[in-house]
Curated annotation (Swiss-Prot):
Catalyzes the hydrolysis of UDP-3-O-myristoyl-N-acetylglucosamine to form UDP-3-O-myristoylglucosamine and acetate, the committed step in lipid A biosynthesis. It comes from the Bacteria. GO terms for cellular component: membrane. Its cofactor is Zn(2+). Coiled coil: none annotated. The keyword Zinc applies. GO terms for molecular function: metal ion binding; UDP-3-O-acyl-N-acetylglucosamine deacetylase activity. The active site is at 259 (proton donor). This is UDP-3-O-acyl-N-acetylglucosamine deacetylase. It comes from Campylobacter fetus subsp. fetus (strain 82-40). Its EC number is 3.5.1.108. Belongs to the LpxC family. Zn(2+) binds at residues 75, 232, 236.
Length: 294
């Protein structure tokens, strides 16, 4: 099984969630063994999508270095991961990925336009060998060994519109497109108003998020799925876990997880070589792990 990249450059424009200004996004092919690289064209600085470059996880996942950063990367990374793309250059002229419609479907459309091609180098994957768990009170995220990766997520909110929701997603590109990619980010009106007063979430609107006001959903079209909220949490998790630097072969489980817990999980997993094995998918190994990339 070979490494992949996109076959041609594609461009898009969208609004930044926090500043509310137009942002140009360019996806470019990249050679083998380069991974996922962000490039800030306005600063001339670049950095890889990997745990050591994560600098903030408060409201979104942020990667960067002393020369600059990029925020709200998880939706784009979720699409890239689900399409099995190993190497890609993400060019931005601002400090955040455009929010698009609050889901990953716009990024999937860009990847469809670009196409995916194989490179000469064999694909590398991170195979989970031991259970690794990170907790914060009753909240937790964990990974366990499995050759047929699944994401099992449970959320619990006091708000009756969300309540308690659980969903199990069997990882594949087809399943991602059908079950996860269209699930939008969500928030509460009171929180949005507070963020706006702080100069944040200025690009947030009913066009790019599900907004909840006490006991009702403000979006006139309603939800895309009955359990869209927990599906979006899985979307986020797929993006956050892709920061491992190679596709993960293992099961992911979360209860009331977060970007912060996901980041701590990737760090914990990679902190001990007994937790995982970096496997090169030559012809023999590709057959062994074929189900993980169906």
């Amino acid at each position: 099984m070979k490494q992949t990249t996109i076959s041609k450059k594609v461009e898009g424009v969208g609004i930044g969630l926090h500043k509310g200004e137009p942002i140009k996004l360019i996806l470019e092919p990249l050679e083998a063994n380069m991974g996922i690289v962000f490039y800030r064209s306005d600063l001339g600085s670049s950095f890889k999508a990997e745990p050591k470059n994560v600098i903030n996880t408060q409201m979104a996942t942020v990667v960067g270095n002393e020369k600059g950063s990029v925020s709200t990367i998880e939706h784009l990374l979720s699409a890239i991961n689900s399409y099995g793309i190993d190497n890609i250059r993400i060019v931005l002229d601002a400090n955040e990925v455009p929010v698009m419609d609050g889901s990953a479907i716009s990024f999937c459309m860009m990847l469809d336009e670009a196409g995916v091609i194989e490179l000469e180098a064999d694909k590398k994957v991170i195979v989970v060998k031991k259970e690794v768990e990170v907790r914060d009170g009753d909240k937790y995220v964990k990974v366990t060994p499995s050759k047929n990766p699944k994401f099992n997520y449970t959320i619990k909110f006091e708000n009756p519109i969300i309540g308690k929701q659980s969903y199990t997603f069997e990882f594949s590109k087809e399943n991602f497109l059908n079950e996860i990619a269209r699930a939008r980010t969500f928030g509460f009106l009171k929180d949005v108003q507070k963020l706006n007063s702080m100069g944040l979430a200025l690009g947030g609107s009913l066009d790019n998020a599900v907004v909840i006001d006490d006991s009702r959903i403000l979006n006139p079209e309603g939800l895309r799925f009955e359990n869209e909220f927990v599906r979006h949490k899985i979307l986020d998790a797929i993006g956050d876990i892709s920061l491992l630097g190679a596709p993960m072969v293992g099961d992911y489980e979360a209860y009331a997880g977060s970007h912060d817990l996901n980041h701590k999980l990737t760090v914990a997993l990679l902190s001990d070589e007994k937790n995982y094995e970096m496997v090169t998918l030559d012809e023999q190994k590709a057959k062994e792990y074929a189900k993980a990339f169906a």
